[in-house]
């Protein structure tokens, strides 16, 4: 089957699953604010769990107590686009590449991040962008 015969949503399936988890965690977090403590705490043993959990947590409230939509929205749109591109161009390697980008950003953040609690999937978004850009140059793929 040719890639052009498959609908675009087939490539968006796994990114949408990841985002659905993020949005469910975010909705839960709007009720229980202390959930974001499971982010990455650089160079602290208690922060190691954040290497796995931090991409799923996004800020839920602004300082005035109102709901903060910006963090999760600003991660969701680029993740959907870049994640779908990863599936499209690297269908057989998608999970392997995503795993290493996911773990790599968490380890990098734990090793070199500021001494604060870090949450959100921005690191994965930047890693996806970097990977797709650099691999495009290496492969000389104009798409």
Located regions from the model:
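Basic, gly/Ser/Thr/Pro-rich low-complexity segments located predominantly at protein N termini
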Residues: 111-114, 125-128, 132-135
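Membrane-interface helix-boundary motifs at transmembrane edges
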Residues: 3, 87-94, 138-143
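Hydrophobic transmembrane alpha-helices
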Residues: 83-87, 130-139
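Membrane-embedded alpha-helical segments of multi-pass membrane proteins
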Residues: 73, 77, 121-130
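N-terminal TM1-TM2 helical hairpin plus the immediately adjacent luminal interfacial "cap"
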Residues: 14-98, 103-118
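N-terminal membrane topogenic signal
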Residues: 2-17
